[in-house]
Amino acid sequence: MTIHIYNTLTRQKEEFIPLEEKKVKMYVCGPTVYNYIHIGNARPPMVFDTVRRYLEHKGYDVQYVSNFTDVDDKLIKAANELGEDVPTIAERFIEAYFEDVTALGCKHATVHPRVTENMDIIIEFIQELVNKGYAYESEGDVYYRTKEFEGYGKLSHQAIEDLRHGARIEVGEKKQDPLDFALWKAAKEGEIFWESPWGKGRPGWHIECSAMARKYLGDSIDIHAGGQDLSFPHHENEIAQSEALTGKPFARYWMHNGYININNEKMSKSLGNFILVHDIIKQYDPQLIRFFMLSVHYRHPINFSEELLQSTNNGLERIKTTYRNLKHRIESSTDLTDHNEKWLAEMKEFQSAFEAAMDDDFNTANAITELYNLANHANQYLLEEHTSKVVIEAYINQLEMLFRILGLVFTKEELLDKEIEALIQKRIEARKNRDFALADKIRDDLKERNIILEDTAQGTRWKRG
């Protein structure tokens, strides 16, 4: 089955056909590193890491680029408030970002370019736009001449005249048209700066991504992604810059994830209801946070609450319990082959359904439903008196593979298994010695730890409740 992606540009699902067979060029807008990220900032890395993982699962070679904006008005403001320089603050929060998203199961991008390390190509990009008549210098600033780009507004599906009607020129801006936007900002006294043909200054936000995407992925890319809030003006402006320069389509597929609400209220710093990732992963397993985020389709908003998180945790633990019980059953399983094909064939259907969900615009919500169905199917098999090692291992491998696609892992608990086996052996010895009080105490202690014993003709079996 082919993959279909909802393209913000066309507002419809389209069959995914990359520019080069089995290769994907993917650019995801990264953070401005002036503070710790909150859970809203963390949704794009988790969502698009999962997209990348699934594409790789399907055999694509994914070139995944995600940038750091390490010089910006917000960084300059933070530096002034803290009495530190911009590079020091940027470095601190880049390190914090990696700690947070790694905990959340995100792989590093193929490249994590920084604005400050690519200033030469950014300045060259701006100069080329000036040379082509798409940009102009004004008292040390450089602005993009929006009216020169015929397709402006095509991503956000807005007419340029409607956009102009709602725009205005702010005090201190030296642009010709309210819709024009800054490509280069002249440095103010005491600000960090770089030398350029227009004097000392630094780049505007939008030009950075256009320049770095072109440097690392070429004139045209397959997927450009980010949060819904970036579609306008950031991504709209990227299209205007890149397509004006190259004359080629910038990105074939535009993907945007939805917002996060906190207790049914939009999350925002002004309301003070945002949750920092480095705080919440101290309270909850980071894998639970990721599983929760993926339990909703990426384009839909998420309502974040402790109640919903706990409910999701219950579901995740059911899957993990099934996995642990399967691991435990391997030792007591045999090489029998009766009914193997039936169970293996049914198991394969769950993988097919999982992949069908992911093929449909990376619908992780429906994919997770199939993960639950697979776990329930495995639980039915575990009720069999005799189980096959081949089938048990197939369940384990399939659960691990589907978890891996979602960026999740099963926690290894071999040591705990050995502890349980040792206690069971101690209970067997107690029963042989007719010390039934000790045997009952061991059984009850294990039950308190959610370990259920079952005495059978073949010996004592155990499972996690």
From Swiss-Prot:
CDD domains: CysRS_core. A motif ('KMSKS' region) lies at residues 266-270. It is an enzyme of class 6 (ligase). Zn(2+) binds at residues 29, 209, 234, 238. Monomer. Its EC number is 6.1.1.16. HAMAP family: Cys_tRNA_synth. It catalyses: tRNA(Cys) + L-cysteine + ATP = L-cysteinyl-tRNA(Cys) + AMP + diphosphate. A motif ('HIGH' region) lies at residues 31-41. Its cofactor is Zn(2+). Belongs to the class-I aminoacyl-tRNA synthetase family. The gene is cysS. ATP binds at residue 269. The modification Phosphoserine is found at residue 270. One of its GO terms (cellular component) is cytosol. Gene3D superfamilies: Cysteine-tRNA ligase, C-terminal anti-codon recognition domain, HUPs. InterPro entries: Cys-tRNA-ligase, Cys-tRNA-synt_Ia_DALR, Cys-tRNA/MSH_ligase, CysS_C, Rossmann-like_a/b/a_fold, tRNA-synt_1_cat_dom, tRNAsynth_Ia_anticodon-bd. Binds 1 zinc ion per subunit. It is found in: Cytoplasm. Keywords: Aminoacyl-tRNA synthetase, ATP-binding, Cytoplasm, Ligase, Metal-binding, Nucleotide-binding, Phosphoprotein, Protein biosynthesis, Zinc. This is Cysteine--tRNA ligase. One of its GO terms (biological process) is cysteinyl-tRNA aminoacylation. The keyword Ligase applies.
